């Protein structure tokens, strides 16, 4: 740990405390994530270490770089590239108004990062505005990629903050255990709507039941034909047959027609029907977009 000088505590993440620090040799600013390990645990599980070391190979401009893994008997510290703020803080600073071109650019970068990881069979599983980081050049980077697989998706942060369900798809809310890349695509859809509404969450549920009701009230309760596997999920229970909202115009008023179409393709209750990151990047919504 002598290699890094701690500057200040940034906050409590899902897995532990995060510090801003400086590399004593290069003077580079980094983020140190001290992963909390259970006291009764035998130190760091080897499976977690294997997963984490794989993440060092994820090199992409829209993924937060994992520079280093510092491991002692009871402590695991992950050294990440430093970014100035997360998307949640960014929303707070834009006062309820976000330019449609910025929305498009941020979604494009989110999908680029997702596409890269998905092509390497790495899922995020816990995407939300708090782990989308933005640096001072306006570049968006996905943080905490793959940590959910290494450490499990926690039910609550150890700081007692409940891990949000707002970005979880219906299949996961119904107890699906076999995840595919579609879990991240649903979350991307929720974040897209939140971008379009300058920070207003699409489905701010209070618990699993409320979360599913909010989803079905907007998208319609799926029928057996629309989603045959739904009734087989471990925690499935029937919901009232809500009709789908005829148009998303009132839901995302600032989003144009092609944007609404892309959103509808991301927010499919049946995971099999959800668009992939690669397909989303080819969507007409981006036809007039020139990446910087």
Curated annotation (Swiss-Prot):
Residues the record lists as Phosphoserine modifications: 72, 159
GO molecular function: acetylcholine receptor activator activity; ATP binding; cyclin-dependent protein serine/threonine kinase activity; cytoskeletal protein binding; ephrin receptor binding; ErbB-2 class receptor binding; ErbB-3 class receptor binding; histone kinase activity
Source domain of life: Eukaryota
PROSITE patterns, sorted: PROTEIN_KINASE_ATP, PROTEIN_KINASE_DOM, PROTEIN_KINASE_ST
Compartment(s) of residence: Cytoplasm; Nucleus; Cell membrane; Perikaryon
Activity: how regulated: Inhibited by 2-(1-ethyl-2-hydroxyethylamino)-6-benzylamino-9-isopropylpurine (roscovitine), 1-isopropyl-4-aminobenzyl-6-ether-linked benzimidazoles, resveratrol, AT-7519 and olomoucine. Activated by CDK5R1 (p35) and CDK5R2 (p39) during the development of the nervous system; degradation of CDK5R1 (p35) and CDK5R2 (p39) by proteasome result in down regulation of kinase activity, during this process, CDK5 phosphorylates p35 and induces its ubiquitination and subsequent degradation.
Phosphothreonine carried by residues: 17
Phosphotyrosine: residues carrying this PTM: 15
The keyword Nuclease belongs to this UniProt entry's keyword annotation: no
Enzyme class: transferase
Catalytic activity: L-seryl-[protein] + ATP = O-phospho-L-seryl-[protein] + ADP + H(+); L-threonyl-[protein] + ATP = O-phospho-L-threonyl-[protein] + ADP + H(+)
InterPro entries: CDK, Kinase-like_dom_sf, Prot_kinase_dom, Protein_kinase_ATP_BS, Ser/Thr_kinase_AS
Protein name, per record: Cyclin-dependent kinase 5
């Amino acid at each position: 740990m002598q290699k890094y000088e701690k500057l200040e505590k940034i906050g409590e993440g899902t897995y532990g405390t995060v510090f801003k620090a400086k590399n004593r040799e290069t003077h580079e600013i980094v983020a140190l994530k001290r992963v909390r390990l259970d006291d009764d645990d035998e130190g760091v599980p080897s499976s977690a270490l294997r997963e984490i070391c794989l993440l060092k190979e994820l090199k992409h401009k829209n993924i937060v770089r994992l520079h280093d893994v510092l491991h002692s008997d009871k402590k695991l510290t992950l050294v990440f590239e430093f970014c100035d703020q997360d998307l949640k803080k960014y929303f707070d600073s834009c006062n309820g108004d976000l330019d449609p071109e910025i929305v498009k650019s941020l979604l494009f970068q989110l999908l680029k990062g997702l596409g890269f990881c998905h092509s390497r069979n790495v899922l995020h599983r816990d995407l939300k505005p708090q782990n989308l980081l933005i640096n001072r050049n306006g570049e968006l980077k996905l943080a905490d990629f793959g940590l959910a697989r290494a450490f499990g998706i926690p039910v609550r942060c150890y700081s007692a903050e409940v891990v949000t369900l707002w970005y979880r798809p219906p299949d996961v809310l119904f107890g699906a255990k076999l995840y595919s890349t579609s879990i991240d695509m649903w979350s991307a859809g929720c974040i897209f709507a939140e971008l379009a509404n300058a920070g207003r969450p699409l489905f701010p549920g209070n618990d699993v039941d409320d979360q599913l009701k909010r989803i079905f009230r907007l998208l319609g309760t799926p029928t057996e034909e629309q989603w045959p596997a739904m009734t087989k999920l471990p925690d499935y229970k029937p919901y009232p047959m809500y009709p789908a909202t005829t148009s998303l115009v009132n839901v995302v008023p600032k989003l144009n027609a092609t944007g609404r179409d892309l959103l509808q393709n991301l927010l499919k209750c049946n995971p099999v029907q959800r668009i992939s990151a690669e397909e989303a990047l080819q969507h007409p919504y981006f036809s007039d977009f020139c990446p910087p």
